[in-house]
Amino acid sequence: MNLIQTLEKEQFDKLSAGKTIPEFGPGDTVIVNVKVVEGERSRVQAYEGVCIGRSGGGINESFTVRKISYGEGVERVFPLLSPMIDSIKVVRRGKVRRAKLYYLRNLRGKSARIVEKKQDRPAKVAAGAAE
């Protein structure tokens, strides 16, 4: 491991020490709680939308969230380890076959919906229901 990788690993561990970042990817609906500073006051603002892509890696990783606000599409890019992010919560998992969902920018209404990923039930529960 070279010097740059060692320094990035130290910074990554330092920044992600107090945070729990859930596993999520493109197509997942997430709620990002962002710290907003207005003058001397600071508050937490929830930003809910569909993750349309993740980029970068390690300390430079970021993700893009898209939502429709008052009929207008709004996209926001968040650095994953930003101190301005209070928490990230996954609301639902989306079933997609692409890493970047930029095609959603051109879709409106029902065509812009993403199918929810169905979770398989464990075999024991299915076998118990059959008896």
Swiss-Prot record:
A Pfam family that the UniProt record links to this protein: Ribosomal_L19
Entry keyword set: Ribonucleoprotein, Ribosomal protein
Record's keyword annotation contains Nucleotidyltransferase: no
Keyword Ribosomal protein recorded: yes
Gene Ontology biological process: translation
GO cellular component: cytosolic large ribosomal subunit
InterPro entries cross-referenced by the UniProt entry: Ribosomal_bL19, Ribosomal_bL19_CS, Ribosomal_bL19_sf, Translation_prot_SH3-like_sf
Domain of life: Bacteria
Transmembrane segments: none
GO molecular function, one term: structural constituent of ribosome
PANTHER family cross-referenced by the UniProt entry: LARGE RIBOSOMAL SUBUNIT PROTEIN BL19M, RIBOSOMAL PROTEIN L19
Family statement: Belongs to the bacterial ribosomal protein bL19 family.
Function: This protein is located at the 30S-50S ribosomal subunit interface and may play a role in the structure and function of the aminoacyl-tRNA binding site.
Protein name: Large ribosomal subunit protein bL19
Organism, as annotated: Rhodopseudomonas palustris (strain HaA2)
Gene this protein is translated from: rplS
